[in-house]
């Protein structure tokens, strides 16, 4: 498909609504206006007009908005038709537009892609549009808007500019080795490099917060039957999300709840009790439980405090601990403190966190909530923060690695050429975030995840 085509798509969600919007972008948007409206509306003014079929009969009437390029969202001529939100009406209007030569349905994200290709947005800003639409909390929405307005891009561009100046300095030292001053060893380049590394570390810390805000944390509740896993899910969710009975093995399948802790998304997963399965259905449920455990960010190892006094997970259930993925964080949750009389709270046991609570009464659950937030390093004071995706974190990590390699080359052998190459690679990694250096394949993957009309 060519970027020279004129594209059209519904910009409002499918289904019935008060208003339905069709968006057209491209060279033939002007022809669409003249064919459907009978005239070209005044630029950037709302014009109330009938939307006409090919034979001149009215299909609908509504607001027409005309944005001649390059002063539009996509940088091209853009026409928006805002009519009534009935699916039949919108479908009739869409079919009418597609009878005109040179028009086609837009691919998902193609409007935003054209805005990027026409330098109306950089790649991080374009991604922020999708993140703003998908935001699941007020804090995520505010951070996505900050990214859309360029907060993240400005931080990245500042780093790129600093690296450009540093590269110029290093290249000068390489090209003029006979100067009286040895630029590589006089400490100035090292000081500048340390400054860039410190700035990059600060951006990475904020990006990790932004990624948490966007991606959330996947927490799996696991343990033996009747340990109180479903009761804990209900306590964290604040509602009766799971059936709770005294019958062991009540939960047969995976249950999922999406909550927020001070703005941080938390994906809680309740699983079937782990034991030797009594039938095929239970076996499948236990198998799914292990699949979820292997993909978790953290496991809450639920222990019935009335059955054991042990607190070390390796002592409580060594076979379970041995099967867990290496380096998977575990929080031991000793439940039923209302029965055992244990002191509520959190402590450390052999490198693992231990929380004592009562899922039935809710006592101690707030301690667990705070622990989950702190274990991910989530900061609730993110004024001016931005959202970040995993690819952003990877690019920032790659840039940091190249800068550390460059520093080693500088301090170890005063190797200017190798330092210059590491600086170039770091700059290239950062440029992938904003799209200044990005493969077509990556662009395709990013924009294909967008809504059709965006």
Curated annotation (Swiss-Prot):
Pfam families reported in the protein's UniProt record: MMR_HSR1, MnmE_helical, TrmE_N
UniProt record, GO biological process: tRNA methylation; tRNA wobble uridine modification
Keywords: Cytoplasm, GTP-binding, Hydrolase, Magnesium, Metal-binding, Nucleotide-binding, Potassium, tRNA processing
Record note on cofactor: Binds 1 potassium ion per subunit.
Subcellular location: Cytoplasm
Listed SUPFAM superfamilies: P-loop containing nucleoside triphosphate hydrolases (SSF52540), TrmE connector domain (SSF116878)
Gene3D superfamilies xrefs: P-loop containing nucleotide triphosphate hydrolases, Probable tRNA modification gtpase trme, domain 1, tRNA modification GTPase MnmE domain 2
Domain (TrmE-type G): residue spans on this chain: 216-377
EC number: 3.6.-.-
HAMAP family per the UniProt record, alphabetical: GTPase_MnmE
Subunit field text: Homodimer. Heterotetramer of two MnmE and two MnmG subunits.
Protein name stated in the entry: tRNA modification GTPase MnmE
Protein's organism: Citrobacter koseri (strain ATCC BAA-895 / CDC 4225-83 / SGSC4696)
Gene name of this polypeptide: mnmE
